[in-house]
Amino acid sequence: MPGVETIKSSWADEVELDYGGLPPTTETVENGHKYVTEYKYNKDDKKTKVVRTYKISKQVVPKTVAKRRTWTKFGESKNDKPGPNSQTTMVSEEIIMQFLNSKEDEKANDPLLDPSKNIAKCRICNGEHWSVNCPYKGTAMDTNLMEKKAAAAASAAVDAPKSGKYVPPFLKDSQKGGMGMRGRDDTAAIRISNLSESMTEADLEELVKKIGPQSKMYLARDKNTGLCKGFAYVHFKQRKDAAAAIEILNGHGYDHLILSVEWSKPQNN
C-alpha cells in the first residue's frame, strides 16, 4: 500500500490558520503621543494595518464634562476602554456654538429704539414718548402743566406789546378794556377741530374748564346719528383765556387724536 504524501504549506499560511482571525488592537504611549495599531480587511479582502497617532494634551473642563466621561459604558461597548472607540465613534473637529438671544438682537438693531434717534418727547413728563401715551395724563402732573401754560400764555398776552411781537387787533382792544357796542365778545371764541365722534359736551367742558371761565360752548353733532362732527366752538369770558387755550390745546393729544385749535372766524352780519 503506497504511503500518503503530505504536502507542506508555507509558514505564513500556517500562522494564519493557527490564529484564525485578525491580531488584537494595541496601544502604546510614548513622548506625549498615543499610538493605536489595529488590523482590518480592505475591499480586496486583504489584511491591512492601520496606525493612528493621538497627541495627548491636558485641558481644564467643567465638572459635569469630567463626570460624564467616567460614566460606565453599556450595550456592545460595555467592555470598551474610557474614551471614544474608533469603531463606533468618529471624532471630528470641535465646533464652538454661541447662543444669542434673538429679542436682544432685534432691539439692538432697531433704529427706533436708539436714544439718539428718538424724536418723541412728552409735554407732560418730558419722557421719550408721545403725550397721548403718557401714563401721567389726567393726573396732578398734567393739571399743573396746563395751569402753568395758561398762566404763561396770559402773561405773554399782556406783555406782548413790550416785546415788539405782532399782536392781533382784538388783543389790543382787550388790553384797553370793554367790548364796545357788541353784546357778546366773539373775539374770545376758539374753534377746536379733529375731535372724535364719541366727544360729548361733558368731555368738552372737562377739556377747557381748567384754562378759564367760558360763556358758551357748542359741540357740532350730526342730525341723523347724533355723533360729533369733529369740531366745537368755545367762547371764553376773557380773550387772554382764549389765547391760553390755543397755546395749550393746539397739538395736544386727546382720545388718540391730535387737536387743532385756532381763533374762531367772526360771522358776517
From Swiss-Prot:
One of its GO terms (cellular component) is eukaryotic translation initiation factor 3 complex. It is found in: Cytoplasm. Residues 188-266 form the RRM domain. Keywords: Cytoplasm, Initiation factor, Protein biosynthesis, RNA-binding. Coiled coil: none annotated. GO terms for molecular function: RNA binding; translation initiation factor activity. Gene3D superfamilies: 3.30.70.330. Pfam families: eIF3g, RRM_1. One of its GO terms (biological process) is formation of cytoplasmic translation initiation complex. Belongs to the eIF-3 subunit G family. Component of the eukaryotic translation initiation factor 3 (eIF-3) complex. The eIF-3 complex interacts with pix. RNA-binding component of the eukaryotic translation initiation factor 3 (eIF-3) complex, which is involved in protein synthesis of a specialized repertoire of mRNAs and, together with other initiation factors, stimulates binding of mRNA and methionyl-tRNAi to the 40S ribosome. The eIF-3 complex specifically targets and initiates translation of a subset of mRNAs involved in cell proliferation. This subunit can bind 18S rRNA. This is Eukaryotic translation initiation factor 3 subunit G-1. The gene is eIF3g1.
